[in-house]
Amino acid sequence: MRKIISKALSQETKNELHKLEARWANFRFGNPSKKIRVIGVTGTKGKTTVCNMIASVLDAAGKKNAMETTINTKIDQEYTAHTNKSRWVTTPPPEVLQGFLNKAVQAGCEYAILEVTSQALDQNRVHGIKFDTVVFTNLSHDHLDYHKTKENYLLAKLKLFENNPKARFVINEDDANWNRFYSLPASEKFLYSVKKPIEHGAVARKILSSPNGSTFTAAFDDGQAIVELKLPGIFNVQNALAAFCVGLALGLDPEKIKLGLENVSLVAGRMESIRVSKNQDFAVIVDYAHNPDSLKNVYETVREGMKNTGGKLISVLGATGRRDKTKRPIMGALAGYYADLVIFTNEDPYDEDPSSIIEEVAEGIFKGAVKKRQWVLNRNYWKVLDRAQAIHKAIKEAGKNDVVLITGKGAEEVMAVDIDKFVPFSDRDVVKSELIARFGREG
């Protein structure tokens, strides 16, 4: 009945109902955001990693904190992984969200860190929450199935800043939209960049990247710190700068900020390398990249790490059903440009025909083709409907110094095969099984 009523209502009406729900939840739990300092992180990509980095920085500084992200919930030192895709909403409904904040308060946490999506902002899910610090990471092609235009998408992100004029702002100056956020009133504004000097915030200099991580100098108003990240890729340097600026905004010791960033290990399903045996002579990486910009960043990071190895990049990818269809051929084109072998496969089709989704992604491969490579079906690219079989095919094709890159699902442990139907599926588990079958288990 609730679904029938929901379909009959306009989005505007539903948003007003969400606002009422948020007010009630806020009242029920005693307005918890006034008893804890809330940090909100929004942007197309990097939100989960930035949240985990901020939590690590606060831990290093001895500040009790809680966190709610796509992949995990944290209350002080107790972590809970999110494995059910029906639970995998970046920003939960108001009742759940206010309950989480209340638990954080009851646990004695001083800070709470929240991932905040554009949909959550548009739908008033965070209405009534008082944010102490808000972060903008970036804006790129995604979620146009919901917002229709990139301007609407941007306007939704801006709400987090517009609604919190007394908060501290942390903004990525390398993003083309940075000034739309910076122009809004705030108690204090911090910028970060890997490209240009900034007036107040942090900039990365002397960046050295490898497949195992990145080292850079974070230069800020009162000094500098050499940070050795365990996470690879320039995009993770940007993520680290965002967390560094949050630490500065909160008045933390820069040495504690540095320590917290250096303590961050790979986030599950984010550039996660899987190895089962010392005999394994190629790499397998699982990553959540599910939009063009994230996919491009991952491809570039992997390619950078493969320089002079002579190995092939074998890409396994698809696209989610019921989401922005315009990005599907773009992702296929990126695969055509960066990869040597490509396997297009199923990825959370919901109620769409998975074969049709695969066709829409695969048609882009020719647009991304480089002159030295001609794409031929069943010779250097394949369409494999069964995702487990696609992973099997990729690992079978892999040889010495190759990299198998599996994108789209990250650490998720279910696949959405209809609107409300989820079946168990884990890229990571399938990869481990395939590698054990080929190399045996170490130990």
Placement of each model-derived feature along the sequence:
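Cofactor-binding loop segments of dinucleotide-utilizing enzymes, especially the Rossmann-like FAD-
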Residues: T44, T70, N172, V194, ...
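A general structural signal for well-ordered alpha-helical segments in protein cores
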Residues: E21, C51, W178, G213, ...
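Short acidic, glycine/proline-rich loop/turn micro-motifs
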Residues: Q77-K85, L229, A416-D420
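Phosphate-binding loop of NTP-binding sites
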Residues: R2-E173, N177-E188, F220, L241, ...
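Acidic, Mg2+-coordinating active-site environments of NTP-dependent enzymes
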Residues: K34-I36, A107, F131-V284, A369-L377, ...
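ATP-dependent carboxylate-amine ligase
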Residues: M1-N15, C245-P254, L259-G269, S273-G443
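Amphipathic alpha-helical transducer elements in NTP-driven molecular machines
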Residues: T91-Q98, L154, V237-A240, P292, ...
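Short, conserved phosphate/pyrophosphate- and ester-handling motifs at nucleotide-, phospho-/glycolipid
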Residues: T48, N239, D287-N291
